[in-house]
Amino acid sequence: MSELDYYSLLEVERTADDKTIKTSYRRLAMRYHPDRNPGDSDAEERFKAISEAYDCLKDPQKRAAYDRYGKDAFQGGGGFGGFGGGAQDFGGFSDIFESVFGEFMGGRGQARSSVQRGADLRYDLKISLEEAFKGKTVDIEIDVASVCDACHGSGAKAGSGRKTCDTCHGSGRIRVQQGFFVVEQSCPVCQGKGEVISDPCPECHGEGRCEKHKTLSVNIPAGVDDGTRIRLSGEGEAGVHGGPAGDLYIFIHVTPHQVFQRESYNLFAHVPISFTKAALGGSIHVPSLDGEQYEISIPAGIQSGKQLKRRGAGMPVLNGRGRGDLIIQIDVETPTRLTAKQRELLEQFRETETGEECPKSSGFFSKLKTILTGE
């Protein structure tokens, strides 16, 4: 079994990329894994052979040597240190089964359609809270698998095309004798597609796609929040053999702000005020993300932790009308350094205190005295 060509064992073409080789290996390993075929020596031999093949082809240096010299490149020198290690790549039979279960349960006896939708892509974009407030248009750069300009996605060299696979006669499946059983499997020549390219495109090597560098403009609407997902339809990877392109998803990450915290569409901020303003009342001016200065009235006797609200001064509602609220939490600041005059005035104030000025503190100490003395 191991005398077969490694590419044939893995049912891939010699031009297959690493992802294609890995996918095919996992599919075959799931099919022939000893846990799934107890007591089947043929399946065990097949499993060892595909593991040997994958251990070689997954390593760029080993693959290059194999492509040039075949197995002779590894004779007499200890080889690769023992084949069969590829099985550890997936951890166990259950992992293989989970990764390729969908493919295994696919229809039998029919060629797998060569038309496939392109993969979706993800791009993570960081913006500031100010940018989330106002919205903006940003340019992003990505590398994406796009339709090959040379063959226009056909995978075939100009002047040539696809033809029906002579091995499976277009069915995409072949039957293989294994011991007393005949099993059906994907055609190793056309990889289950039912068609082959006789003269591959030299630019994309028959894939029909090439990686391209693209610059895209992304419109960030006002009001986006951390975790908002924006879809750019058709900007993902190009489809295979005429299939539709995937989508590009922009995931928004809003960096923390030094002053404001966001909760839904409301903006919160801690605002310190002097103890005299807290006692006597007054007003403060609070800047917002829209550049406006909002005047907030401070009632006399306000305490630390009290929240004051300015309606309609928060974040814009995404794809809607109106805005959230601006909510400020008052932090009364006690002076740490006093002039002689200020200390004198505060001493005079203390001499005139009756306890009614701060009912909570006087009530607390009265209650504590009652608890401790019983009076």
Curated annotation (Swiss-Prot):
Domain annotation J: ranges: 5-70
ZnF start-end (CR-type): 135-213
Membrane-spanning intervals of the chain: none
Amino acids binding Zn(2+) 2: 165, 168, 187, 190
PROSITE patterns named in the record: DNAJ_1, DNAJ_2, ZF_CR
Cofactor: Zn(2+)
Gene Ontology annotations of biological process type: chaperone cofactor-dependent protein refolding; DNA replication; protein refolding; response to heat
Record bears the keyword Cell membrane: no
Record Pfam families: DnaJ, DnaJ_C, DnaJ_CXXCXGXG
UniProt keyword Metal-binding present: yes
GO molecular function per UniProt: ATP binding; heat shock protein binding; unfolded protein binding; zinc ion binding
Amino acids binding Zn(2+) 1: 148, 151, 201, 204
Keywords: Chaperone, Cytoplasm, DNA replication, Metal-binding, Repeat, Stress response, Zinc, Zinc-finger
Cofactor: how bound: Binds 2 Zn(2+) ions per monomer.
Subcellular location(s) per record: Cytoplasm
SMART domains registered for this protein in UniProt: DnaJ
Purpose: Participates actively in the response to hyperosmotic and heat shock by preventing the aggregation of stress-denatured proteins and by disaggregating proteins, also in an autonomous, DnaK-independent fashion. Unfolded proteins bind initially to DnaJ; upon interaction with the DnaJ-bound protein, DnaK hydrolyzes its bound ATP, resulting in the formation of a stable complex. GrpE releases ADP from DnaK; ATP binding to DnaK triggers the release of the substrate protein, thus completing the reaction cycle.
Quaternary structure and partners: Homodimer.
Family the UniProt entry places it in: Belongs to the DnaJ family.
PANTHER family: CHAPERONE PROTEIN DNAJ (PTHR43096:SF48), DNAJ HOMOLOG 1, MITOCHONDRIAL-RELATED (PTHR43096)
Record text about domains: The J domain is necessary and sufficient to stimulate DnaK ATPase activity. Zinc center 1 plays an important role in the autonomous, DnaK-independent chaperone activity of DnaJ. Zinc center 2 is essential for interaction with DnaK and for DnaJ activity.
The protein's name: Chaperone protein DnaJ
Taxonomy of the source species: Bacteria, Pseudomonadati, Pseudomonadota, Alphaproteobacteria, Sphingomonadales
